[in-house]
């Protein structure tokens, strides 16, 4: 059923622009004739909003809770069709502080598989929260669903820290589940030497920076209208960037087992590029009373 489908996943730190980047890229892939389904695996349920021009799609778990069981749902109730025929599903999650979102993800995926949602597709894309690759959010990797992982990051310290953590999670399941890292997507924050830094990080993680997405306010303008840039401004420079990334993913054959860094290695890299200051830079104030350093 899923033998010829490429099952990819976008992971990344919360707030990095993962859902925005993935939807814009998948919209460009759909423009190129690829048949795509998005499965949102983020409790915020915002993985399909730009495709559907909606606030948030009703989730599999929410409807299942209303009906009593996931078996009582019809596929058409949870799978909607968006921009360029992209199929859209949100797995949803439990109320904050209650239960495991990962269990909801696998429940939703199993329901989709059992009801024929994976037929006539070229790509299935999982959009996954990724500050921490806990057992729950690692579910698409752990269960062998997502085979090809793209990490959305930037030149900021916490985004790189999360990328390294996600690489560690991929490594854990690379041999048992066959999952591979497809590359880093740098969603620019206009950090100094950002492209060079992420290229260096990619090399250390045994992968590639598959694309550098420049920062452009047109992305926010499109988001306010609940649209992808490709639909809102198809001739813009930014839409061309997403099309370039889409082509690279479609043609990507560099799928690797990552080599995550130790924390001191990552910090040394950040110091080298001036993201994290060396203590010597502030030697005149470190360890002094507050009133002395304020003078």
Swiss-Prot record:
Binds 1 [4Fe-4S] cluster per dimer. [4Fe-4S] cluster binds at residues 100, 134. The reversible ADP-ribosylation of Arg-103 inactivates the nitrogenase reductase and regulates nitrogenase activity. Signal peptide: none annotated. Keywords: 4Fe-4S, ADP-ribosylation, ATP-binding, Iron, Iron-sulfur, Metal-binding, Nitrogen fixation, Nucleotide-binding, Oxidoreductase. One of its GO terms (biological process) is nitrogen fixation. Coiled coil: none annotated. It catalyses: N2 + 8 reduced [2Fe-2S]-[ferredoxin] + 16 ATP + 16 H2O = H2 + 8 oxidized [2Fe-2S]-[ferredoxin] + 2 NH4(+) + 16 ADP + 16 phosphate + 6 H(+). Its cofactor is [4Fe-4S] cluster. It comes from the Bacteria. GO terms for molecular function: 4 iron, 4 sulfur cluster binding; ATP binding; metal ion binding; nitrogenase activity. It holds the Pfam family Fer4_NifH. Gene3D superfamilies: P-loop containing nucleotide triphosphate hydrolases. The keyword Cytoplasm does not apply. InterPro entries: NifH/chlL_CS, NifH/frxC, Nitrogenase_Fe_NifH, P-loop_NTPase. Its EC number is 1.18.6.1. The modification ADP-ribosylarginine is found at residue 103. ATP binds at residues 12-19. The key enzymatic reactions in nitrogen fixation are catalyzed by the nitrogenase complex, which has 2 components: the iron protein and the molybdenum-iron protein. Homodimer. Belongs to the NifH/BchL/ChlL family. This is Nitrogenase iron protein 1. The lineage of its organism: Bacteria, Bacillati, Cyanobacteriota, Cyanophyceae, Nostocales. The gene is nifH1.
């Amino acid at each position: 059923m899923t033998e010829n489908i490429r099952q990819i996943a976008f992971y990344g730190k919360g707030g990095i622009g993962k859902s925005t980047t993935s939807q814009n890229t998948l919209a460009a892939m759909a423009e190129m004739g690829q048949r795509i389904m998005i499965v949102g695996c983020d409790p915020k349920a915002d993985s399909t909003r730009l495709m559907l021009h909606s606030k948030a799609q009703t989730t599999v778990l929410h409807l299942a809770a209303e009906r009593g069981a996931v078996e009582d749902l019809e596929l058409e109730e949870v799978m909607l069709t968006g921009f360029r025929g992209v199929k859209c599903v949100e797995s949803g999650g439990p109320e904050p502080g209650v239960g495991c979102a990962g269990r909801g993800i696998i429940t939703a995926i199993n329901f989709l598989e059992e009801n024929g949602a994976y037929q006539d597709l070229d790509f299935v894309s999982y959009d996954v929260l990724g500050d921490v690759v806990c057992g729950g959010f690692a579910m698409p990797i752990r269960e062998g669903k997502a085979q090809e992982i793209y990490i959305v990051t930037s030149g900021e310290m916490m985004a790189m820290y999360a990328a390294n953590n996600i690489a560690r999670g991929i490594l854990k399941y690379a041999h048992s589940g066959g999952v591979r890292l497809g590359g880093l997507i740098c969603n620019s924050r206009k950090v100094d030497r950002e492209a060079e830094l992420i290229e260096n990080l990619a090399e250390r993680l045994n992968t590639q920076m598959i694309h550098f997405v420049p920062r452009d306010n047109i992305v926010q303008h499109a988001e306010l209208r609940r649209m992808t840039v490709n639909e809102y401004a198809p001739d813009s420079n930014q839409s061309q960037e997403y099309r370039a990334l889409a082509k690279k993913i479609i043609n990507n054959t560099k799928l690797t087992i990552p080599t995550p860094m130790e924390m001191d290695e990552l910090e040394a890299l950040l110091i080298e590029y001036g993201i994290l200051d060396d203590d010597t830079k502030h030697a005149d104030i470190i360890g002094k009373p507050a009133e002395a350093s304020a003078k």
